[in-house]
């Protein structure tokens, strides 16, 4: 987990590393290889939890809309593709492109503790219709009483495709769940979890996504 006091010094390094990984499918061992969805994994030396990557080659909404729902307004829509999500709030808006976000999750499975995460989110517009986000857990807030703290590494790249009405969405996810949930179990169960998540994201943005996220016609 990153120290909040020094996290601002690491933002550009996070963005550069995530962009390289998001664009490097060959660096991930394939787990799912469908025309509409690819999922892969790779181990890294600093954590026994694997880094996962999923890719939706075509989402039925432009990048601005998808990025708005999947990143900018995550607290409004996260429950649409993550059923464990309960609530959250913006802890601090550090700049127009950086903020600290807190979220809570309740698995609802006997013996599995509730989880929370406090993460620094950094975004960039790389080009018109190309948006990048990096997420890292930071020690800005202590875990809520009764919650185990997730140590999270995430990244998202959304690119509008030719024609302007659809986009590609790629996502990185590594979750050290903390508590008594071991890495080997998380690694084993993440494939189906991520397939379900990606398919729900696809459905959420079907037909252009929610009207509330669409820009008005000029």
Mark where each language-model region is:
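Eukaryotic helix-grip
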Residues: 1-218
């Amino acid at each position: 987990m990153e120290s909040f006091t020094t996290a601002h010094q690491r933002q550009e390094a996070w963005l550069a590393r995530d962009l390289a990984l998001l664009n490097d499918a060959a660096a991930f061992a394939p787990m799912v290889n469908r025309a509409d969805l690819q999922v892969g994994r790779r181990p890294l030396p600093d954590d026994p939890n694997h880094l996962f990557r999923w890719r939706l080659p075509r989402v039925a909404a432009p990048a601005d809309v998808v990025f708005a729902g999947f990143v900018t307004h995550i607290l409004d829509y996260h429950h649409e593709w993550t059923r464990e999500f309960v609530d959250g709030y913006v802890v601090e808006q550090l700049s127009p492109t950086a903020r600290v976000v807190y979220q809570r999750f309740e698995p609802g499975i006997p013996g599995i503790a509730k989880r929370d995460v406090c993460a620094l989110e950094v975004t960039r517009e790389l080009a018109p219709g190309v948006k990048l986000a990096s997420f890292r857990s930071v020690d800005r807030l202590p875990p809520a009483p009764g919650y185990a703290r997730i140590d999270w590494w995430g990244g998202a790249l959304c690119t509008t495709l030719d024609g302007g009405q659809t986009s590609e969405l790629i996502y990185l996810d590594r979750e050290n769940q903390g508590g008594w949930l071991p890495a080997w179990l998380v690694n084993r169960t993440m494939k189906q979890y991520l397939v379900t998540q990606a398919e729900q994201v696809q459905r959420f943005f079907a037909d252009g996504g929610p009207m509330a996220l669409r820009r008005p016609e000029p």
